[in-house]
Curated annotation (Swiss-Prot):
UniProt protein name: Xaa-Pro aminopeptidase 1
Gene encoding the protein: pepPI
Known catalytic reactions: Release of any N-terminal amino acid, including proline, that is linked to proline, even from a dipeptide or tripeptide
GO cellular component, one term: cytosol
Organism phylogeny: Bacteria, Bacillati, Actinomycetota, Actinomycetes, Kitasatosporales
Quaternary structure note: Homodimer.
SMART domains the UniProt entry points to: AMP_N
Binding residues for Mn(2+) 2: 308, 320, 458
């Protein structure tokens, strides 16, 4: 990683008249300063690289429709939706940036420091996207600042951004001042841009801002055709990532769970933007830890591998799929018994996903099957109705059986309870169905042979007009089909 050139005492003037923001300084740079001659040289001799007649982003029509729905919900109010800022990982390195879901959902843009402002206009709103313009050649920002274009890449001009996103673009450096002077009702999506929030401190309330956040969460409960297509892309890439993992299990045995994590990550970066969440590559007893993301344990033949992972597309839509695989390629008798119980529970859950059904129905259906098996195996005293009423199965099932899926792996999290978990399924909703059984290594209430076995099966289910469609059906689920699939991949 190259060291920034920014001198501690640059020769380039930094008065307010000559630059709107000071060049970021770096201590311990190797260059003592910038000569006037070099500064002048760097200001000129650059070709015009403005782009013209750009094709709008693929989802431009959808983002416009989403903004129209937002406008209709909050007439006469100024709405401010920030993308967020870069976050420091350590010293002068940053985490990879991911724009706020609310901002990306409404604009399609993923640029740090961006802000969407919806200004009341007539019966609706006029949208403006505020972005940082091209790096300034005059003040040295483009080559001296660690966030300048010669360091991190070319930015779109404001005109280019307007063409791409179908929204007029303005300089974000002018926004905070105009917001401070603005009058009338304002709402802002909180938690992403402290500077924008500070400019609105005396104009907003937490309660009103939460209403904006809730609306934008509930707006995503039903996916449009573009979103469904993106989720299918994410799932298809995820299927290929799972295939990649099976092919290298022998190498993982020689190293650790990290090899599995790295293998899947390669697929995610080659075909998508990233992984949608920290991959869970849990071998052996680690499968009993629901969100095992350390991925530093051994991979042993004879154990199970619980792989919970998803590719995120370039538009931020993520898959969320889990399979529990026999590392040797074949389930033991007990592993198969437990796996088949979870499979039966998932089958019952998926069958309950249909328009008009209660959201909770698929969870209840899955939990009933698992409770029946636990009673049948003598692990908990029946009858089944008693077990379910008291929630006794939860010692081994632990978590809810699914969640909404979209631009967040746990999508629509701010939605009202009555719209989500107490709501009714509609065509276009996408959710996971993911029952599991987890027998902890130190659980003395189960026979010793059960201890350390964890199984989860998870698929991404689209509610359709007449039932449902399993977006991740390309991955085998039944135990015998899993074994056949693994054998074919291993050759």
């Amino acid at each position: 990683m190259a060291e920034e050139l920014t001198p501690e005492n640059p020769a380039i003037p930094e008065t307010p008249e000559e630059t709107e923001e000071p060049i970021k300084q770096r201590k311990n740079g190797l260059y003592p300063g910038v000569s006037d001659e070099l500064a002048e040289n760097m200001q000129s001799g650059w070709a015009d690289t403005e782009l013209h007649d750009l094709e709008p982003i693929a989802q431009a029509a959808e983002t416009a429709a989403r903004r129209a729905a937002l406008s209709a919900r909050f007439p006469g109010e100024r709405l401010v939706i920030p993308a967020g800022n870069l976050k420091t990982r350590s010293n002068d390195t940053e985490y990879s940036f991911r724009a706020s879901v609310e901002y990306a959902y409404l604009t399609g843009n993923q640029t740090e420091d961006g802000v969407l402002v919806m200004e009341p206009e007539g019966d609706g709103h006029a949208a403006t996207i505020y972005l940082l313009p091209r790096s300034d050649r005059e003040n040295g920002e483009f080559w001296l600042d660690g966030q300048g274009e010669l360091w991190v890449g070319r930015r779109h001009s404001l005109a280019e951004a307007g063409e791409l996103y179908g929204i007029p673009a303005s300089d974000v450096r002018e926004l905070a001042g105009s917001l401070r002077e603005a009058t009338g009702p304002v709402r802002v999506v909180r938690g992403f841009d402290a500077g924008i929030e500070a400019a609105l401190t005396d104009k907003v309330t937490a309660e009103r801002d939460e209403e904006l956040r809730v609306f934008l969460s509930e707006a995503r409960l039903v996916k449009d055709e573009f979103e469904i297509g993106e989720l299918q892309k994410a799932v298809d890439s995820t299927v290929r990532g799972f295939e990649d993992v099976v092919k290298v299990l022998d190498r993982a045995e020689a190293t650790s769970e990290r090899y599995i994590e790295g293998t899947f990550f390669l697929r995610a970066r080659v075909e998508g933007n990233d992984v949608g969440y920290g991959s869970i590559c849990a071998a052996g007893p680690h499968a009993c830890t629901l969100h095992w993301v350390r991925n530093d344990g051994p991979v042993r033949s004879g154990d199970l591998l619980l792989l919970d992972a998803g590719v995120e597309t370039h538009t931020y839509y993520t898959a969320d799929v889990t399979r529990t695989l026999p590392i040797s390629g074949t389930y033991s008798e007990l592993q198969k018994k437990i796996y088949d119980a979870v499979y039966d529970a998932q089958e019952a859950g998926i069958a309950a996903v249909r328009p008009g059904a209660k959201y909770r129905d698929f969870h209840d259906a899955s939990q009933r099957v698992l409770a029946e098996r636990l009673v049948e195996w003598g692990l908990v005293e029946g009858p089944v109705e008693r077990v379910l009423e008291l929630g006794l199965q939860r010692r081994w099932t632990l978590h809810g059986t699914g969640h909404m899926l979209g631009m967040d792996v746990h999508d629509c999290a701010a939605a009202r309870v009555e719209s989500y978990v107490d709501g009714t399924l509609e065509p276009g909703m996408v959710l996971t169905v993911e029952p599991g059984l987890y027998f902890q290594a130190d659980d003395l209430t189960v026979p010793e042979e059960y201890r350390g076995i964890g199984v989860r099966i998870e698929d991404d289910i689209l509610v359709t007009a007449d039932g449902n469609r399993n977006l991740s059906a390309g991955l085998p689920r039944r135990s015998d089909e899993v074994e056949e699939w693994m054998a074919a991949l291993k050759g």
